[in-house]
From Swiss-Prot:
The keyword Ribonucleoprotein applies. Gene3D superfamilies: 3.30.1330.30. This is NHP2-like protein 1 homolog. Pfam families: Ribosomal_L7Ae (PF01248). CDD domains: SNU13. The lineage of its organism: Eukaryota, Amoebozoa, Evosea, Eumycetozoa, Dictyostelia. Its main location: nucleus. It is found in: Nucleus, Nucleolus.
Amino acid sequence: MADSSNNEKAKPLADSKLTLTILDLIQQSNNLGQLKKGANECTKAVSRSTAEFVVLAADAEPLEILLHIPLLCEDKNIPYVFVSSKSELGRACDVSRPVVACAVTVDDKSQLKSQITNVKDSLDRLWIV
C-alpha cells in the first residue's frame, strides 16, 4: 500500500472528476493507437517529445520507479498528472494488469485533439493552485 510519504511525492494528484475525464480519454486514445503504456514506453515517448501528456499512478510500489518521468516532462515542457490507482489506469489502458504510467501521444489529425487540449488546460490549472 502507498504510504503518506509516497502521497507527498505524487503531485499533482488529479481529483475524482478529472481522473474520470483522463481515464476516458486514455481509453479513446488506446482505441486510436495514440497511447504508450508502461514506464519504459512512457519514458521513450517523453524523451522523443511525442507525448501530449503523461499519467502516472500514485500507488506504484515503489514510487521511485516513476519519479524520473516528471523530471523529463518538466525538461520537455510536457504536462503530467498522478491518478490514485494503477488498477484503474490498467483498465483504462485495456490491459489485464495494473499500469503505473502511460502517455497520450501526438497526432495532428486525431479526432481527440479538442479533448486532449481540454485535459492539458486542466492539468495546467492544477499547477496554479
